[in-house]
Amino acid sequence: MKVGHGCVRLEKRGEEQISLFDEYIYVEYNEEEYKKVVRSIKHKISEEAYACVYYACLSSEQDALDTAYRFLIKGFKIGSDITFMRNDPDVMRIKDIRRKVLHETRYFMEFARFNSIDNKVYVCHLEPESDVIYEVSLHFADRMPSENWL
């Protein structure tokens, strides 16, 4: 059995076909562990590195989580300089993923249109590729605080 970072791959559950020869470990969400990881990324690497990883987690790209994992391994070794290493393939890829997610977020902020239902609630239908609904909802919560909207 092989061990080490080179033998680990992160992916979202249900995204890939299951292989007969791989071992799958499903990780459940833990609020305490989440806070520790976020704090470690921000303090040991940088805020920008955290932002890159955050947007990679929102991405629909198949390799996004694995790229974030590889980026973090290098980031914890190198420190805050990792975000400036544009010749590294993992850094280039995570920056590209971040750019795509931010572009999709801005697209829905600009082009989302709401329809009024009985003058009580505004409804907008969005089908983003990435998980950007939360980011878009923050924008509209700020712009339409007195309205009821979905």
Identify what each model region corresponds to.
Residues 1-31:
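N-terminal ordered "arm"
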